Amino acid sequence: FQKVSEVQRLCPETQLVSIGDRESDIYDLFELAQQTPDAPGLLVRSDKSRNRKVEQEYIWDYMAQQEKAGSLKIHIPRSGSRKARDAWVDIHFAQTELQRPVNNNKSISSVPVWAVYIVEQDGQEVNDPIEWMLYTTVPVQNFDDAKKRVEWYAARWGIEVYHRTLKSGCRIKDRQLGSADRIEACLGIDMVVAWRIYHRPGQWRATVFSRQNRRRSRRRSAGRPPGTPPPALP
């Protein structure tokens, strides 16, 4: 968040948003966002184990009772044993305040945020249904605002796919270049390659890679050095 704040000060005309997963659900972070002049927006997925309450009611129960603002279809990419799928989710939102933890007497008593609750329709029919709670310092005034916050958070999946392409596809960790400058130069090339592959997942490989490159790629995947003929059948 502090690094994004530094960039935000360099481009005050642009709205930047720091996005965090459940490990970022920390009261002190929201307090910092409120107290930082010209701070970027903050969007964090809540950890359901946090015993946060609104008007003495568990916030997850409270948000589930709010009027549904609308529905949205999101794409859930493949991850491990989880298959890729599209899911329809219902969206609820409300302005609320995060109360400081009971064991924290040094922080301010509460921090205003907007909560966006996302729950999958017919979630009982899937093994891992979507149920998210997002807290954000960026105002949510209507369904379009809430939809945009959900899309911001869902964009993290694209970042994960990009990093996986860089790591597994480009094999950046296998580079043995001997110096930081060489690694940095190589990373600059591989990042562009990973970015182009990420944005062209449905294109036929011949539109991007030449026949020679495709042949070399197959040989490398098979563990044969360039120029090695394929094994002969007995």
Regions found by a protein language model. Give the residues of each.
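Single, function-defining residue in the core of a domain
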Residues: 1-234
